[in-house]
């Protein structure tokens, strides 16, 4: 009996050691790129920090990136939150599956296949070289609709039925029941949307011609690779907001689930 317990403890200890080693390897693999990004920035000279056309170019690109990220996430969440709720509330199972399959189809469709139709649409409505054109082309996010649909399906239908019996309208059901319950999903979706908009590259390359409207990802791509320290410093400034936002989102979501 004691021998079996000792063997179990030894096996458990070996498993913990193995998991610890694997975790350490994974940590090193994830941390090394950050080290290679941060440490070269200490060798940069202050006079070389702004070797672009001007400091205002970098600030303008940062502003454009912030506009795309903040305005984009607001538009996407309003559309996806409403669409996810509407699909979940459809009484017909076939109709619900039709919308879900449509979202999955657009989710699996390569983004490059939509570039030409999007370009033609923006050209015909006169929004080709503008940030609002980019915002419109990124407003529909199938993955976000599916996420909010999944969140809505997890809500007990008796909550909606009881509120409906008390005279609540669909707007009240949406605002008082659905939105508060799915708030953690909204937080996660907002972060993923901001991260995607922050790193947007293909659409700006295709739809924007005026350099004053370029996001920061375009400016970084066009920087010369001769000065690696400068590029690392600007990349670090580029990712710092996302890192801060990530930890804020993790803290917010974990606190909500623990409540």
Predicted regions and their residues:
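Short, Lys/Arg-rich, polar N-terminal cytosolic tail immediately upstream
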Residues: 1-13
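A structural signal for multi-pass alpha-helical bundles of membrane permease subunits
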Residues: 15-259
């Amino acid at each position: 009996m004691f021998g079996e317990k000792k063997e179990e403890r030894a096996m458990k200890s070996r498993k913990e050691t193995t998991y610890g080693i694997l975790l350490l390897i994974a940590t090193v693999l994830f941390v090394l790129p950050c080290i290679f990004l941060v440490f070269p920035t200490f060798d940069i000279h202050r006079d070389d920090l702004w070797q672009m056309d001007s400091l205002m170019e970098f600030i303008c690109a940062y502003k454009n990136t912030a506009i795309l990220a903040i305005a984009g996430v607001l538009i996407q969440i309003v559309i996806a939150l409403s669409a996810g709720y509407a699909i979940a509330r459809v009484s017909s199972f076939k109709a619900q599956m039709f919308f879900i399959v449509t979202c999955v189809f657009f989710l699996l469709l390569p983004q490059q296949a939509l570039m030409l139709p999007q370009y033609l649409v923006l050209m015909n409505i006169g929004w080709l070289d503008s940030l609002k054109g980019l915002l419109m082309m990124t407003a529909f996010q199938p993955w976000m609709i599916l996420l909010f649909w999944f969140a809505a399906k997890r809500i007990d239908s008796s909550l909606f039925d009881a509120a409906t019996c008390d005279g609540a309208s669909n707007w009240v059901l949406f605002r008082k029941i659905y939105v508060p319950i799915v708030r953690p999903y909204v937080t996660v979706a907002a972060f993923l949307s901001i991260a995607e908009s922050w790193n947007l590259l293909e659409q700006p390359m295709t739809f924007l011609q005026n350099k004053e409207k370029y996001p920061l990802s375009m400016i970084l791509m066009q920087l010369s690779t001769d000065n690696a320290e400068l590029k690392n410093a600007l990349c670090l400034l580029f990712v710092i907001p996302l890192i801060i936002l990530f930890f804020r989102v993790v803290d917010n979501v974990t606190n909500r689930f623990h409540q």
